[in-house]
């Protein structure tokens, strides 16, 4: 009969902590409407409207949120401009001691990495790169079923300019506490 000796330190998978619970109200399935500022999509770009959907799910035993965003952008007279798509992955990075996210979209295409923090009812991410310009993404909870989402940029590292802002409505029940 063979007896296996247990090593003193077996590897173990990471476990989701309270930081992931704190993200739950922000990462739901949403639909939204809003507007893109003139010059928001680059110099000379017109004001536009946007309507979109987000679908988010927990993956890897609750360690990460995996989200897909899709938005139709139109001129203010209703003419179609483009369909924006973005894939978003976020969670608590224990090594850095902060929220981290990465995104890939079809408008650059760009692959970006962000650092995040929760400030009360606000979830704020800023581009991790130290160079300029930088992006800031903010989710603001306006109640159990509503939020505002803002996208801003800075050219100097101090003053932030609004690119776009949306009123969001949850399309699924609130997470249980």
Residue ranges and their predicted role:
Residues 1-177:
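Hydrophobic small-molecule pocket/channel-lining residues, especially in calycin-type beta-barrels
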């Amino acid at each position: 009969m063979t007896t296996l000796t247990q090593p003193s330190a077996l590897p173990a998978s990471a476990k989701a902590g309270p930081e992931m619970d704190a993200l739950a109200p922000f990462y739901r399935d949403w639909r939204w409407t809003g507007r893109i500022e003139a010059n928001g999509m680059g110099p000379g770009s017109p004001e536009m409207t946007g309507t979109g959907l987000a679908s988010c799910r927990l993956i890897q035993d609750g360690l990460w949120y995996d989200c897909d965003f899709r938005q139709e952008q139109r001129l203010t007279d209703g003419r179609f401009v483009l369909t924006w798509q973005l894939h978003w992955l976020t969670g608590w990075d224990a090594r850095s001691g902060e929220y981290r996210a990465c995104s890939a979209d079809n408008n650059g295409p760009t692959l970006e990495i962000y650092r995040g923090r929760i400030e009360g009812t606000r979830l704020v991410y800023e581009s991790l790169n130290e160079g300029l310009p930088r992006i800031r993404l903010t989710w603001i909870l306006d109640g159990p079923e509503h939020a505002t989402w803002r996208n801003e940029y800075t050219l100097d590292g101090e003053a932030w300019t609004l690119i776009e802002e949306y009123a969001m409505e949850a399309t699924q029940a609130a997470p249980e506490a």
